[in-house]
């Protein structure tokens, strides 16, 4: 079976505010439609991505800001952070883990807990290893995003 991730539904409290944020982030607006006041779907896709996000009225019963751990992959974490900050996105400083493990444990765009042995250190991974340098941010509702630098993918990816 060939399974592909297509859409992630984000819970937001204000559709127009979320739409403005994701436009500022630089995602492509694919669709903004609704047959009634009770239902409206706004669909964005990150440039070059096969997976999109969708939010709006009547889309989900989940609490606004409850989605965490959405990863956006970049080839140059410092350049991506700089560009997003220039667009007005509040992005954390770049960091890496002392043990070189994949980063996880975030809420609202920032760390709230870590896996055993994780130690968050400032800056890019010293050897520039793929999958090892991160920055975080959140949308206006607190849905948490992670920028992850990947310059060389794992085999089969």
Residue positions per predicted region:
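Core segments of cupin and vicinal oxygen chelate
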Residues: 2-3, 9-52, 79, 86
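N-terminal beta-strand motif that seeds the catalytic metal site of vicinal oxygen chelate
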Residues: 1-19, 67-70, 146-157
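Helix-adjacent hinge/juxtasegments
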Residues: 55-85
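Vicinal oxygen chelate
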Residues: 32-33, 40-43, 72, 81-157
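Residue-level recognition of conserved beta-strand positions in structured domain cores
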Residues: 46, 55-57, 149
């Amino acid at each position: 079976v060939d399974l592909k991730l297509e859409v992630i539904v984000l819970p937001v409290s204000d559709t127009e505010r979320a739409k403005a944020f994701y436009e500022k982030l630089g995602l492509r607006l694919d669709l903004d439609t609704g047959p009634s006041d009770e239902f409206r779907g706004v669909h964005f896709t990150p440039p070059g991505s096969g997976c999109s996000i969708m939010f709006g009225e009547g889309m989900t019963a989940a609490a606004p800001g409850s989605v965490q751990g959405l990863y956006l992959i970049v080839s140059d974490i410092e350049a991506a952070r700089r560009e997003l900050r220039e667009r007005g996105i509040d992005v954390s400083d770049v960091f890496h883990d002392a043990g070189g493990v994949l980063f996880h444990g975030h809420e609202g765009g920032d760390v709230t807990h870590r896996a055993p042995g994780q130690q968050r250190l400032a800056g890019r991974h010293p050897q520039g290893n793929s999958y090892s340098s991160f920055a975080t941010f959140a949308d206006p509702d607190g849905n948490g995003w992670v920028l992850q630098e990947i310059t060389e993918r794992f085999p089969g990816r």
